[in-house]
């Protein structure tokens, strides 16, 4: 379980926790959305922090709401080292209740990329950049081309 391994926990310092912190993000944030989730973010020099809002309108059962939050926390835990600083608040939409865990995770990643918090992945099927040879790297015995 995560409690026994502190490296796998989601630290308190990486969470938006109080009503005042949520209010600051909602009042001063930029927004982007997806059919499953909505992201409110506020960039800053602070380490990245995540807040979640999953209401009973999304799923009336606590089990369903907790599943959505668990998937988002797990995705955030793996992204913390490469994520840009600031506060990120995810608001789940009712379609998230019927979505699978990978669909929720993919929607979260899409929103973070759209917000500029994550680097864009390399396009599949593209060639790697060509290695150029600098003239100083050629040995003296090799002829110049």
UniProtKB/Swiss-Prot annotation:
- Compositionally skewed regions (Polar residues) per UniProt: 134-145
| PANTHER family, sorted | RIBONUCLEASE P PROTEIN COMPONENT
Compositional bias, Low complexity, is annotated for 120-130
For this UniProt record, the keywords arranged alphabetically read as follows: Endonuclease, Hydrolase, Nuclease, RNA-binding, tRNA processing
What lineage is this protein's organism placed in?
Answer: Bacteria, Pseudomonadati, Pseudomonadota, Gammaproteobacteria, Lysobacterales
Q: Which PROSITE patterns match?
A: RIBONUCLEASE_P
According to the record's subunit comment, the protein's assembly and interactions are: Consists of a catalytic RNA component (M1 or rnpB) and a protein subunit.
Family membership, please give it.
Belongs to the RnpA family.
Tell me its EC number(s), please: 3.1.26.5
Q: Which reaction does it catalyse?
A: Endonucleolytic cleavage of RNA, removing 5'-extranucleotides from tRNA precursor
**Highest taxon of the source?**
Bacteria
- Write out the GO biological process terms: tRNA 5'-leader removal
Protein name per UniProt:
Ribonuclease P protein component
Question: What job does the chain carry out?
Answer: RNaseP catalyzes the removal of the 5'-leader sequence from pre-tRNA to produce the mature 5'-terminus. It can also cleave other RNA substrates such as 4.5S RNA. The protein component plays an auxiliary but essential role in vivo by binding to the 5'-leader sequence and broadening the substrate specificity of the ribozyme.
**UniProt-annotated stretches for the region Disordered:** 120-145
Family annotation (HAMAP family): RNase_P (MF_00227)
Query: Which Pfam families does the entry mention?
Result: Ribonuclease_P
- Which SUPFAM superfamilies does the UniProt entry name for this protein? Ribosomal protein S5 domain 2-like
Q: Give yes or no: UniProt keyword Nuclease.
A: yes
Q: Which GO terms describe its molecular function?
A: 3'-tRNA processing endoribonuclease activity; ribonuclease P activity; tRNA binding
Q: Which InterPro entries match?
A: Ribosomal_Su5_D2-typ_SF, Ribsml_uS5_D2-typ_fold_subgr, RNase_P, RNase_P_CS
An example Gene Ontology cellular component term from the record? ribonuclease P complex
């Amino acid at each position: 379980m995560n409690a026994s391994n502190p490296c796998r926990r989601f630290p308190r310092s990486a969470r938006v926790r109080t009503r005042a912190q949520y209010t600051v993000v909602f009042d001063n944030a930029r927004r982007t959305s997806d059919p499953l989730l909505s992201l409110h973010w506020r960039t800053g020099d602070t380490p990245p922090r995540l807040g979640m809002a999953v209401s009973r309108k999304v799923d009336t059962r606590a089990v369903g709401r907790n599943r959505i939050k668990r998937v988002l926390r797990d995705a955030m835990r793996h992204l913390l080292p490469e994520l840009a600083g600031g506060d990120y608040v995810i608001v789940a939409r009712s379609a998230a209740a019927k979505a699978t865990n990978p669909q929720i995770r993919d929607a979260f990643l899409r929103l973070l990329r759209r917000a500029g918090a994550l680097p864009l992945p390399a396009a599949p099927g593209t060639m790697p950049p060509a290695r150029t040879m600098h003239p100083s790297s050629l040995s003296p015995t090799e002829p110049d081309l």
